[in-house]
Amino acid sequence: MIEKLNFHLRFKTNFGQTIYITGNHPLLGNGNIEKAVPMVYLNEDYWVLHLATKGLLKAETICYSYFIQNQDGTRIFDWGSDKSIIVDQLATKELVLIDAWNFTGYIDNAFYTAPFANVLLQSKGLQVKAAHPKNATHIFRVKAPILTTNQSICIIGEAKEIGGWDATKALPLNKIINQPYFEIALNLSKCDFPLVYKFGIYDTELKKFVAFESGNNRVLYEPVSKNKLVVVQDGFAQVGHNQWKGAGVAIPVFSLRSKQSIGVGEFSDIKLLADWSKKIGLKLIQLLPINDTTATHSWMDSYPYAAISAFALHPMYIRLSELVDSNQSHLIQDALDQQIALNNLTVVDYE
């Protein structure tokens, strides 16, 4: 049963800024931003929060995040939803969570969006059998969205328990299913602290160390003590930023003409574009704005960036034949009679 819960956030704030923590538990404001709990400034690198939790944590999953409040009341939010505590999986009296701030603008975050996570990078991140001792004192978690086939993440450092900087003794991390991070649990009870370490790339097929991450060594100051578990959520491994490359096509919808179009590309033509892109190996499709631009009812409305609404889509991209059934086809017959002539034009007859 967790009796003490300690949050440590690595972040350098400016004068007048305060960091808050919010989460789906009464101790963290129960999801209400206005009831978020302020953290305490420790030093130029850390903000902390210590909570007494004896008897207050059930077998539940607590999701939490951080935000910065400036002197003028504006807020900057930590990006993502991967910070969580699965209470019944952590058998300890004291839990220390050492987190890294996730800036929205980090390029790595783009690779966790739906197109990459569900399609383009779906097969990446192979499972590795990582060590997980029952008497673990520390758990390390790190994210690495851009890895090639047969690559995983490993940890290596100064202490002999993490390889003693011997690349042949690097320890592979396991990719956690349905989570964005890799993880390894270690017993560091015989290590000297501060602990100096780095993450690296590990070849899961050859079972060997490939390369160190870029940047400075990482340093962990939280030592071992009885009945305490330290979970280090280390942000992103500094690897692979330039490993993913994908060709794509940028095109306005109005230029997509198929045999079913009536002189202008339509939303339904995007399916054909997607099929063609897949066939020739393209990875991305960028469309020019598709918002309604009808303002003057003249050719001047053809400029796709002159939107009159941020929400309304342009009606000219609708496929008329998909709006009517066989009993209503006469309603669009006039347009269908001009279909071939309009499709043969070199430019869109906007008026």
Stretch-by-stretch model annotation:
Residues K12-K58, Q69-L90, I146-F193, Y202-V224, ...:
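Aromatic-rich carbohydrate-binding modules that target alpha-glucans
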Residues K93-A136, P145-T148, S225-Q260:
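Compositionally biased low-complexity segments at domain edges in trafficked proteins
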Residues G215-H241, D269, L284, T293:
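Extended acidic/polar, glycine-enriched regions
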